[in-house]
C-alpha cells in the first residue's frame, strides 16, 4: 500500500491465469521464512525493497501448474517498501502498478486464492 491508499498489483506474464491481475509473490525457497520469501519475491517482480513484512493471514490452496496439482499454504503480508515511486515489472510480472482500493474488483484477479485473500483484506480495511 502507498500513502494514497493504493495497493500494488501485477499483471501475470505467465500461465496459469496469464494476463490477469495478481499480487506480487511466489513460492518460498527451501530454508526461507515467509517474510524472507515475500521480500525476495517483491524485489524479483517489482524491483522494490521491502523494509517490513507484516504477516496478516494464510489460506490453504490447490495450485495446478504444468499438469501437477500442488497443495500449498498461501501467506498474505502487508509490506512497507523503501520507495513507492520507483518500480518496474520483472520476472513473472508483465506489468506492475498501484490500484486504488475503491477500484479493486476481485474478479479481475486470475487465481481463486488471491481473490479470496483480497476479499478478506478488503473487509478488514472497511472496519
Feature locations, PLM:
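The catalytic Nudix box helix
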Residues: 23-56
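Active-site-adjacent beta-strand/loop module that shapes the phosphate/pyrophosphate-binding cleft
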Residues: 59-86, 125
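N-terminal strand-loop-strand
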Residues: 1-22, 50, 81
